[in-house]
Amino acid sequence: MVAIMTGEPEAFSLEKRYGQAEAVLCSAMSIWETVRAVARKRKVGVAVAHAEVETFIADFALRLIAIGESETREAIMAHERYCKGNHPAKLNMGDCFAYACAKTNGAELLYKGNDFALTDLA
């Protein structure tokens, strides 16, 4: 979401993938991270960034999923397998939860960079 919203070089290809996906899911944690990153990168207030993220979510018909017991368990397992210091993927907390939400819900993980490419979801 951040790459598209802030016009990063990968924005066009990611936007195309969002448009082609059967369903695009996100969690409250990914929304929080996106709001924080958009506010920082675009030098706008959190309220402005939040409104922009909400518009993005509506435009792409993203479906908010809850982080429940299964997602939590998967995130912990992802941390054990792929965290910084243990694996070249170097997943951080937000990455582990994105991984867990995708894996638990049988969804394709839309990402940029090489971190997730080094996991079993690639």
Regions found by a protein language model. Name each.
Residues M1-M29, K41-T55, L121:
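Short, well-structured N-terminal submotif of metal-dependent ribonuclease cores
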Residues Y18, A58, K103:
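Anion (oxyanion) recognition and catalysis
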Residues C26-S27, L91-N92, G113:
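Histidine- and aromatic-rich ligand-binding microenvironments
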Residues A28-R36:
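Short, conserved active-site loops that position catalytic residues or coordinate cofactors/metal ions
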Residues V35, A39-S70:
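Active-site-proximal, substrate-binding regions of enzyme catalytic domains
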Residues R63-E108:
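Active-site neighborhoods of divalent-metal-dependent phosphate/nucleic-acid chemistry enzymes
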Residues I76, L121-A122:
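Short Asp/Glu-rich motifs
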Residues L110-L118:
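Gly/Pro- and small hydrophobic-enriched strand-loop and loop-to-helix capping segments
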